[in-house]
């Protein structure tokens, strides 16, 4: 420990004559007797008195004070404040009344106490606290009063003063906890016992001297023991409780207790007490009281009033009170006075809380406000709290509903309002047709209710009284609309009738020109409900007649009848009562099942209108009415048997809606209702939906309400709701709603199948069975696939095109020419197959000499701009003779590049008929097609076409080649059009070539041989063909033009290497082929080649 050298010097001196006294460890107020050695004339109080009578120099005393100030910070500025009035008088007197204590040597055993205190190692705080922040500038000299302007925040409870407001707030929390504990009865009763127990437990456990323990017991105040508890943060376990001073005015006590000479002699070897160090903030203090006060105020501000325990945090003090001082459980009147103690959160509230009225239907959570529930429902994906009063659809947001209502307003003409929905009056003819429909339907619904209840056993008065409450539910049951779950008015719900009346009617903008077919469909719906109600009423009367003797007073109300009616109607009932298996309505055309009749009527728009002959046969009846009549007639036949039979079990399930009577009564009800309400029925002159949409009217979808400008777009859109897919793929199970989707499917997945089948003469072509026709035509083609395909694409093998050079190759242009005949497609495909065979033979026979004779016959047209869109057909078209094309048409241009390698359809590369040699060699499953004019080979038709365009056209040769002047070029002979087949036969017989198959077998080895062998074979074949040609023509070789030909060959090779056409061909092969072609006589050159060379 750090001890000043002056203390060591003082301990080495002789002890004083007078017995020294020990300074008090706590600064609690106490009465201090004056020492006989102290004189009032002493100028100041010395902190350390010399042990021997040898006086120390004044300079040494000053140096000692300066070093002490450097070792430790000044004492804490917070002096003790008296808790009780009168304690100040009991404490040490002021500096004027009592002289300062005589400076004596410190108690020798005080060093042992310091060693015991400093032996503990604190681990709660490692940072050093700056005690200068709490320095009091006006601190008085030891022994005087300590009050100054630094302590500006006094405590109103105990009177302590603090320099900062934060420290005062921490101090005030301890008072608030004490006040709450004192208010309880267990605190008053057990305070004395706990005080005695803690006094006995807080004794010094370490052995100290008897006189020191005695002096501490004398100094303790019995009224209010204020002791610093041993806390985990400040390790004072097993040491004397240090209580800081509680009075602000009282100075720091420096009293000493008398000691005996024996105790002094025993403790003389102990060194002097150094400065006291705080284990939490590493601060040093001169006395233990200052250290205890420092710990009490800064580190442990929360002190327990029932024991010496103190804590640095309020939560630890509260936990200590719950563990060490739990309150007893006396009666509630004594322990818990009114308003003093708050009820814990676990205790139930005395008054019963009202259950929130707004409950979430999805999760069951309840809310007190409606907007809370609305905000909560947004969490659920299926929350559709904004309901449409017309059609019953739900939306998540209000603006969605607002936009949806525009559909009904435009369709029903409700912008001006429809307030008069009663029976039709005198001025009803002036209004729009939708208003007439609404009024007529409303009146007929009331009539239906009267007819349904006409045979009932109840009186007319009772039925009229009960009709007011059940009108809305019965009307909804007739119309097949959902029940009203949002308390909407019946006027709003009746507007939904117009959705049935205006199906496919462009919003009623046509005025009096309403479609009779749509009105007939609406009346069929209402009449079917009426007949079903009558049938249900008759069955109920029969049941009542059997049970009348048992229950004579039992009567069924109108509401009960309406409920039974809705359950009986099934498909026309509410949507909530429908299940997925109930589908009683069947479309007579396609056989699809629907839940209600209005869905069948909406589905009728999908099918194309029948021909005029069929309409005249039916007497001009519209298709919708015919569908309804067929459905009604089909289901009425089953209903007649039900009405006469006694089996009641057949009235359930899908057959329940079919019990509507015969077709005669069905149409009689329609005519009766239509004539009574002044609405005209369907007439032969009524316009069809297609003719109606020709104007400016809009077509609305009856399912979702979307508007379309034409019936075609509506027809395509309705397929989404009805599931109609008329365009089916002939190769797989795919079916599309539009022709474009089937085109894309065939182009993407079935190109090779379509191409292979389109070019085969014996098999019908499946390409585009229903692309140019209507859905009805597509259905006919599906029913008779063989007949339609043979008539459209079938071609007899004996057919030959009239003009081979004038036909166009329409590969890639089929989307632009959907209306062209299918036979032209096949003839064009056959043309290109013939050209492939002939071009292969000419390429094998005449490598370069007679190339322009072939091009002269089939002139290359100007290539139009080819679209970058992927064409419909991009693969090779293999004809009957097994040859492939390398040329473009006059209209279609070149086919887009397709570098994919596809397997050959006919293995071997040559068909069975085998009219000529193949244009390439088979390598694996791919055919390497060789160019007619050069040794270039490729398996892609597109790449070969591009090669021909870049390298073997007059324009490309004009750019590459230099003009060749020759004396023999002056005489030009106009050659007539040669037939390549005749030329082949003529040369083949003279040269010893047996057949084209032998020639193919001789060249088939080129595609799989090594490069050197391939080059040699090509050279031998070319030289052999050239030698035979020379022997036949007997023309000498032109040797004087060898230099010019070499220059042309070099220039052409450089150009071709730049274009990348000869990437896979050796240079010597290209040079030899060009040299062979240059040795041909001038007579054999065509007109076009002669013109190019003449330039």
Swiss-Prot record:
Q: Where is this region: Disordered?
A: 1-107, 320-343, 453-472, 532-560, 630-698, 743-810, 866-924, 951-976, 1003-1095
Q: Which domain of life is it from?
A: Eukaryota
Tell me the compartments it is located in. Nucleus
Stretches of Acidic residues bias are at 61-71, 1042-1056
Instruction: Specify residue ranges for compositional bias: Polar residues.
Output: 665-680, 872-891, 1061-1076
Q: Which GO terms describe its biological process?
A: notochord development; regulation of DNA-templated transcription
Functional summary from the UniProt entry: Transcriptional regulator. Recognizes and binds to the core DNA sequence motif 5'-GGGGG-3'. Binds to the col2a1a promoter and activates col2a1a expression. Binds to the sncgb promoter and activates sncgb expression, as part of a complex with sox9a.
Name of the molecule in the record: Zinc finger protein 219
Q: What is the lineage of its organism?
A: Eukaryota, Metazoa, Chordata, Craniata, Vertebrata
Instruction: Name the encoding gene, please.
Output: znf219
